Amino acid sequence: MVKLAIDMMGGDNAPDIVLEAVQKAVEDFKDLEIILFGDEKKYNLNHERIEFRHCSEKIEMEDEPVRAIKRKKDSSMVKMAEAVKSGEADGCVSAGNTGALMSAGLFIVGRIKGVARPALVVTLPTIDGKGFVFLDVGANADAKPEHLLQYAQLGDIYAQKIRGIDNPKISLLNIGTEPAKGNSLTKKSYELLNQDHSLNFVGNIEAKTLMDGDTDVVVTDGYTGNMVLKNLEGTAKSIGKMLKDTIMSSTKNKLAGAILKKDLAEFAKKMDYSEYGGSVLLGLEGTVVKAHGSSNAKAFYSAIRQAKIAGEQNIVQTMKETVGESNE
């Protein structure tokens, strides 16, 4: 049995989509228990495997992260993180304030001993539909080569345990594929990655080929990773809008759109990274999953499923025994 703590109040569409996702999750997974934290006035579920706990406070999207975690002690996010810290829950999921959730992860759940800096990881789509693991996408704006090596080690475990990939191929995001390309960070990181024979490091990868499906894990610093992630999100939205405008521009195009409706829907599903769940803060003493702030019920459900798999696979213990112990 896996037990997850859920922030009912976090996100643009909370609590409605959270309640819908939680209801579906406990119906689909008979080995899942939920502790739901939020406002009792908004709670309307009744299930034997859902425990509700009232919280008098909520962390808003505009709240300053560290201050909010320290001052709003009875917020749904803080109480959720405390449940993971105490061992009462195996992991947690929230669509709330990203900075506050990362602060809760660091200051409440706690960092694995030996992990220098936790990394935020997402799974992004590829043209072949299998996706790739991408980190760090914003936990740390600055990074040293040693941090990128550790990100690769964390990403390697994540790809194996969560995505079910044996001996995942690991690449370093760079401005060229040649080993000598890049700045001092990428050059030194390349050397360290190449020297770690426990990793299946296959070299540099350029941003233009990220979605080709040639690698399983891509490592970069949080500043670069966050910009790449937002660029991919923005490009996908722009292409979708352009395609819709083109289809609606004439009767001929509308007919073509109707004929291709099923294929276009399949394409949209393939490129929808919410299918893979939320982003995960790796390197902590518990599983912390960040669902997108604008998540619908489907995306939040995927994030719950992702946290459940992490609990089943005991990914935190694996990271302690490998990444943590090797860096003590």
UniProtKB/Swiss-Prot annotation:
It is found in: Cytoplasm. It comes from the Bacteria. InterPro entries: FA_synthesis, Phospholipid_synth_PlsX-like. Keywords: Cytoplasm, Lipid biosynthesis, Lipid metabolism, Phospholipid biosynthesis, Phospholipid metabolism, Transferase. It is an enzyme of class 2 (transferase). GO terms for cellular component: cytoplasm. Transmembrane segments: none annotated. GO terms for molecular function: phosphate:acyl-[acyl carrier protein] acyltransferase activity. This is Phosphate acyltransferase. It comes from Staphylococcus aureus (strain MSSA476). The gene is plsX.
